[in-house]
Amino acid sequence: HTHHSKPPYRVVDQKKLAEAIQAGYECYDSMKDDPHHRYLSWEYCHGAFRLNRRPQIDATIDYLCLHLAWYLASWGMLRNSFLMQKDYKIHADVVRLIYQPEWDDLWDLSPEKLSQEYYADRIMKLSESITEAYVASGAGIPTDTLLTKILLGTVGCVPAYDRYFKKA
């Protein structure tokens, strides 16, 4: 059961995807001078998720929830969101979900794989599962932008489909 009237993702041609990735590199280059730039929170968040594959203890889940919450906050994802009224532990079920073996093939997808319909469908299924996890925990329905920021910061399988990416 899905909460989207239309899929938030579509298969993007590789040239456009490569251009978007290049824009990301340029953004990264522009923040090199500030060792505490807010965009670095993505690196810390995604790095924590990559280093802690298959978390078995609640303390690790808690640690990853904190990383995810701060990353989302630093990227402005609390504004006008159900997350504004929740603590960081609201992400626990989502953290457990993304570590299920079912999603292993989505971790750090290459642009070539991202442009394939098979992976686009898998990302859609994971997005729907994330939405269902938040709804089941009484949180709310995440926007498409929030979903892609979560996927970017954790699994690293999509760029964030925010207004800048959509414009590109």
For every predicted segment, state its role.
Residues 151:
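Conserved SAM-binding loop
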